Amino acid sequence: MAHSRARRRKRASATQLYQTCKLTGTCPPDVIPKVEHNTIADQILKWGSLGVFFGGLGIGTGSGTGGRTGYVPLGTSAKPSITSGPMARPPVVVEPVAPSDPSIVSLIEESAIINAGAPEIVPPAHGGFTITSSETTTPAILDVSVTSHTTTSIFRNPVFTEPSVTQPQPPVEANGHILISAPTITSHPIEEIPLDTFVISSSDSGPTSSTPVPGTAPRPRVGLYSRALHQVQVTDPAFLSTPQRLITYDNPVYEGEDVSVQFSHDSIHNAPDEAFMDIIRLHRPAIASRRGLVRYSRIGQRGSMHTRSGKHIGARIHYFYDISPIAQAAEEIEMHPLVAAQDDTFDIYAESFEPDINPTQHPVTNISDTYLTSTPNTVTQPWGNTTVPLSIPNDLFLQSGPDITFPTAPMGTPFSPVTPALPTGPVFITGSGFYLHPAWYFARKRRKRIPLFFSDVAA
């Protein structure tokens, strides 16, 4: 292993060492003579300069610069150097000015005043000036009457034609003869020119009419499987009806399955389903087919981060639940409408059942307007497995074969007087309840129209 050589640190200059070690007396022996210019070379120059004068050659211990003028090559003359700097102004000679005459001015006498070229003063004459005017006896009255101008314009109207030109009126004379003049304008036959259809055949696929039929725009597709959405499959059936149970506990904000759901989390909590953690919004559902399946989808918005302005930042997730596969039926089954029966029909393929009992021994119940009586004696008979229609009471007996009229016990007249009697034993009322008509078994439910696209989600 090669050892790296230590980096050599630069020694301080002699001037820096002199400033710190002069006071303490710890300077190296070569620092003080160099700074104070007391080296051997300095001493030789000092002693040799007593007998030899070198001028401005600049010979010394400093760097060799050749003096102020620099080195000059041999055999050439030195060029004059031009120093840069502010140019000195030429000196201005100041001449002193001394008074040659005294500054006292003597007064001049009045007789010495000469007014040369001055205008003479004319004394003003008393009186006014005359005004010459022409004598005019006519008063200055201006004629301000309004001058009327008449403008006549003639234009030609091709629509209007004077009737006297086209067809003159017949003159009438008073001599007893009526003369009727024929019109001077004769009619000419009108020439009929057949109109030709001007058709231009063109290969351009332009509009063939003035008002073309607008085309149908393609339906926008919902981008549920883009890279911006994270795909999560939900297996809980509650996602179809009450998705709020998978996010929060008893959230009253939820209003229905076909609207967007919003959630607000005031504190840190765990969602009932980990896949719905930090969800703040569920968009409207959409039902579509995906690879042979009926798929129920919703887009959720996470609120992982929020800024000071209140804006939430988070990922968007596509939750989907596969309801059922779409497969071809193994066989076609004809469906019959379930309607009310119009006549009495019996199942001829039902199991034969012939009870060995006299119909007259069956308990008969008499229902009157006011009283209800029943015979206390009853006959118990075991029942067999019989197919009975829903619209027929179970107190009638069915028998395979054609329609059979069963004998019935004669009913009492409701107008005959009936003496009420107290029952001596327990009362058994044989009968059945009511049967709902088959047409009312399946009540009509209002179908909710679920849109196949998200109305509040950008595709």
Curated annotation (Swiss-Prot):
Motif Nuclear localization signal: chain residues: 1-12, 442-450
Compartment(s) where it occurs, according to its Swiss-Prot or TrEMBL record: Virion; Host nucleus; Host early endosome; Host Golgi apparatus
Listed InterPro entries? Late_L2 (IPR000784)
The UniProt entry's GO CC annotations, sorted and at most eight, read: host cell; host cell endosome; host cell Golgi apparatus; host cell nucleus; viral capsid
- Record GO biological process: microtubule-dependent intracellular transport of viral material towards nucleus; symbiont entry into host cell; viral penetration into host nucleus
Point out the coiled-coil segments of this chain: none
Membrane-spanning segments = none
Processing after translation: Highly phosphorylated.
What is the recorded function of this protein according to its Swiss-Prot or TrEMBL entry?
Minor protein of the capsid that localizes along the inner surface of the virion, within the central cavities beneath the L1 pentamers. Plays a role in capsid stabilization through interaction with the major capsid protein L1. Once the virion enters the host cell, L2 escorts the genomic DNA into the nucleus by promoting escape from the endosomal compartments and traffic through the host Golgi network.
Subunit: Interacts with major capsid protein L1. Interacts with E2; this interaction inhibits E2 transcriptional activity but not the DNA replication function E2. Interacts with host GADD45GIP1. Interacts with host HSPA8; this interaction is required for L2 nuclear translocation. Interacts with host importins KPNB2 and KPNB3. Forms a complex with importin alpha2-beta1 heterodimers via interaction with the importin alpha2 adapter. Interacts with host DYNLT1; this interaction is essential for virus intracellular transport during entry.
Record-given protein name: Minor capsid protein L2
What is the source species? Human papillomavirus type 6a
